[in-house]
Amino acid sequence: MAGIVGYGVYIPSYRIKVEEIARVWGDDPQAISRGLVVEEKSVPGPDEDTATISVEAARNALRRSQIDPSEIGAVYVGSESHPYAVKPTATIVAEAVEATPEMTAADLEFACKAGTAGIQACMGLVDSGIIKYGLAVGADTAQGAPGDALEYTASAGGAAYVIGGKNCLADIKETYSFTTDTPDFYRREGMPYPRHGGRFTGEPAYFKHVLGAARGMMEKTGLSADDFDYAVFHQPNGKFYLKAARKLGFESEQVKPGLLTPVIGNTYSGATPVGLAATLDVAEPGARILAVSYGSGAGSDAFIIEVNDLIEERRDLAPSVAEIIKNKRYVDYALYAKFKGKLRMA
């Protein structure tokens, strides 16, 4: 089965603290931080969008992969915040990394799991022999209405993965998906912000699908939580992530490396891919990782990944997630609102 030849991440440098958002809306910042397990989140600059984030992440992935970009046969960008309604983000990324023109490209949408859907698509094309390498990106500049609970977590960032059959720094040993029609979160065409079902987004949506995919994978492979060195889950907030881990029998040491929501918020399509990248940054050869995404609507993709010796040669060829996160500067709510386009002139 195909594996990970290279991976890369990009997170905007701007940050806003939970306290600053709470100050504007008269909320209790300590209660929010405790309830969501979030302290601050990333904010895209005025010149950043899903396309620019995807390009930066892809370039970092190619640095680690050490391949010729012209050998990439497919580029998929998964997001729910593509900058154009009719104009693919994937072609922008492909052109920027010099993968064009002998390749296919497409934008994918499935709420927050579109990035892992792209990984699966690349795996299929690689394993079938149609392409040599595929590039899958999960990135977002997430939306949250002013004053809505989502505003405390909806952030920006993304990760890219070069998928191939040889010279892999990690092998994808198995994949498994769990999908139903569950309308927990949606945004119609023309709506500036999504709507969500509040508590309905928990048990019947996130937990049903994340746990369903993880348990389905374990049943399929005969593995249990004790058989994994690390686990990464979709992280709309830190609370859901840690609760899912406990329900599946994972210890905090297994899931802590991939938990990034407390310091960058929920990067939506980037959440699981970025968390996986942070885990690959610290994993030793031979480590086994369980990664489970989630997308509202709703579905989860699960992967079993085993790290190879090549990780030690390529890990330092691009910035680590920790290094990228450390590069930050804070903004107040006024600048945040300006950057996010929340202030609209008549």
Swiss-Prot record:
GO molecular function (one): acetyl-CoA C-acetyltransferase activity
InterPro entries with a match to the protein in the record: ACP_syn_III_C, HMG_CoA_Synthase, Thiolase-like
Catalysed reaction, written as an equation: acetoacetyl-CoA + acetyl-CoA + H2O = (3S)-3-hydroxy-3-methylglutaryl-CoA + CoA + H(+)
Pathway per the UniProt entry: Metabolic intermediate biosynthesis; (R)-mevalonate biosynthesis; (R)-mevalonate from acetyl-CoA: step 2/3
Pfam families from the UniProt entry: ACP_syn_III_C
Entries under CDD domains matching the protein: init_cond_enzymes (cd00827)
Superkingdom of origin organism: Archaea
Active site, per annotation: 80, 112, 234
Residues holding (3S)-3-hydroxy-3-methylglutaryl-CoA: 28, 112, 153, 201, 234, 243, 266, 296
Annotated keywords: Acyltransferase, Isoprene biosynthesis, Transferase
Record-listed E.C. numbers: 2.3.3.10
GO biological process: farnesyl diphosphate biosynthetic process, mevalonate pathway; isopentenyl diphosphate biosynthetic process, mevalonate pathway
Residues where CoA binds: 199, 239
PANTHER family: 3-HYDROXY-3-METHYLGLUTARYL COENZYME A SYNTHASE, HYDROXYMETHYLGLUTARYL-COA SYNTHASE
Subunit (UniProt): Interacts with acetoacetyl-CoA thiolase that catalyzes the precedent step in the pathway and with a DUF35 protein. The acetoacetyl-CoA thiolase/HMG-CoA synthase complex channels the intermediate via a fused CoA-binding site, which allows for efficient coupling of the endergonic thiolase reaction with the exergonic HMGCS reaction.
Family affiliation: Belongs to the thiolase-like superfamily. Archaeal HMG-CoA synthase family.
Role noted for this protein: Catalyzes the condensation of acetyl-CoA with acetoacetyl-CoA to form 3-hydroxy-3-methylglutaryl-CoA (HMG-CoA). Functions in the mevalonate (MVA) pathway leading to isopentenyl diphosphate (IPP), a key precursor for the biosynthesis of isoprenoid compounds that are building blocks of archaeal membrane lipids.
Protein name per UniProt: Hydroxymethylglutaryl-CoA synthase
